[in-house]
Amino acid sequence: MFNCDEDLKAYEDELYHEETSSDESIDSELEFHLYSQVHYSQNLSESKPEEDTGGDSVTYVPGAKQQNNACTEKDDKLVDIIILSDSDAKVSDTCPVIILSDTTEEDSVYSSKIKKKYSSTYVQGESLCGPCSHSTPKVSAPQSNNFKSQKSCQNSSSKNYSGGYVQEVLVIRGSSEDEEANKSENDIIISESDMSDVENWMLLGRAKEDGDASIQLNLEGYKILSDDEGERGAAWSISEKDVEAQIGNYTPLRRSNRYYTDKNVVCRNCDKRGHLSKNCPVPKKLPACCLCGERGHYQNSCPSRYCLNCFLPGHFFKECIERAYWRKTCHRCSMPGHYADACPEIWRQYHLTIKAGPIKKPKSHSGQKDIVYCCNCAKKGHCIYECKERRMNSDKLPTCQLVFSYDHEYDIRKRNERTKSKIKDFQKAGLLTCEMREFSESKVDAKPPAKKRKKKHPSKKERKGTIRDYECAETKQKKKHKKRKSGLQEIEGDFPRGIPNSYVELKKPSKKYDGSFLHLDKTKDMFKNRQKKTRRGKRCSSAVDQDLLIIKQKKKKSKRKVA
């Protein structure tokens, strides 16, 4: 194309609009376009230092001798000049693209390092320019061996006649890059995008898409990747977990398990291993009730549901016989909302009882604490049952947290009897469907009935301290006191002091025996009364003078036999 060096220099002067090569000033237009190429070059900030091999670099070296004197400063570097094919075309007014590559990065300010790939075929003697010149058309030409042998740095110009425009490209390389380029020619990769009509410079993010060509699916063996495709280059294959995981238990629309999860799962429906309940072939279980725990019904239709008014099972609040809970008053704690049989004090009295048996009572009376806060108004000095302000929840009535009385065995037995009678009333009304089941021992634990033994009455020592002993003693003393008074009055009537006025009166004549049995009954009563009087007289003889005692002796009458 250019036979002489003079023609080459003349063309170079026309290209750069320079009169002499000794001019050290930098053209402002060239500097502007150079900065624009650096700024708009793709993946400038995303380039990594790991991708150093096989890539072109765009650098801006500060100094006045950037264009013409850049190669003279480094004479030991080998220069590669890309020559484009000749054809008739017009020279474009656009600024040429200058690509500078330098192995040493000490003086560089802007650098872009991207992997370089060469096409496997040379169509009409064209080669790839490099990923840095995305804003320029694809221009390439076979490199001549004459220019490779030259070691002196020379500026070369080229023309591209595709589309009727010329685009000048200046490529400066070092000797180390030529060796890497020769190695990379041996490893040639053909991509689908190169075979299509769309060229590489028309695609955005081409550098990222190049790596996607190495993705392979459903691998069964292993493959060693080349160094150009990745730095690892290690042998890899499908993980053993992927092979061992037998993921066949899933619906066609959604996978039920991941490959790393354990397949030894237990089904909640059939209690077998290997599948989940949603994939179980056995029909699903019926729902369980939260009240009775049986399957086949829900809480609303449970036969053992309980009432919120009387707290008994079998019916709801609307069907309850008793009055509403807000109209009830407890005679045990004097609180509204319940009766004595459902008083919370019943279970609250077992706060000291640990073992089965009688309820333990505290030795000292535990009163209310000095520092008390109300949970309704959050004020100090009173509890919720003493609060006079409006309730936060009007449906629930307050109760006292203190224990006023402790139950005895008699009270517990009576309360159980009352609950049984209440259950019978509900059964008659048809509100309680479940039957009462008493505790029955199993046949294994059942024992033959023991012989009945005589009940031994407790001795006097054992009786001491009971309430009945005190009551019996009081009644005995009262009876003795009454007997003493009655005995003294009878003695004075039988044994008067002095001669009373009634003694002068004549005695009435006795009646004769009529032959009836009524007389015998009267005589028996009279005899018993006389015996009682004599006993009382002996006891009270010390209180009466012996001289004044007149003992009346009567003759015993012989009983007549009735013929």
UniProtKB/Swiss-Prot annotation:
A zinc finger (CCHC-type) spans 265-282, 287-304, 305-322, 328-345, 372-389. Keywords: Metal-binding, Nucleus, Repeat, Zinc, Zinc-finger. It is found in: Nucleus, Nucleolus. SUPFAM superfamilies: Retrovirus zinc finger-like domains (SSF57756). PROSITE patterns: ZF_CCHC (PS50158). Residues 464-476 have a biased composition (Basic and acidic residues). GO terms for molecular function: RNA binding; zinc ion binding. Residues 449-463, 477-486 have a biased composition (Basic residues). InterPro entries: TRAMP_AT-DNA-binding, Znf_CCHC, Znf_CCHC_sf. Gene3D superfamilies: Zinc finger, CCHC-type. Residues 143-157 have a biased composition (Low complexity). GO terms for biological process: nuclear mRNA surveillance of mRNA 3'-end processing; nuclear polyadenylation-dependent CUT catabolic process; nuclear polyadenylation-dependent rRNA catabolic process; nuclear polyadenylation-dependent snoRNA catabolic process; nuclear polyadenylation-dependent snRNA catabolic process; TRAMP-dependent tRNA surveillance pathway. It holds the Pfam family zf-CCHC. PANTHER family: ZINC FINGER CCHC DOMAIN-CONTAINING PROTEIN 7 (PTHR46543:SF1). The keyword Repeat applies. Component of a nucleolar TRAMP-like complex, an ATP-dependent exosome regulatory complex consisting of a helicase (MTREX), an oligadenylate polymerase (PAPD5 or PAPD7), and a substrate specific RNA-binding factor (ZCCHC7 or ZCCHC8). Several TRAMP-like complexes exist with specific compositions and are associated with nuclear, or nucleolar RNA exosomes. Its main location: nucleus. This is Zinc finger CCHC domain-containing protein 7. Residues 133-142 have a biased composition (Polar residues). Residues 41-64, 133-157, 443-494 are annotated as: Disordered. GO terms for cellular component: nucleolus; TRAMP complex.
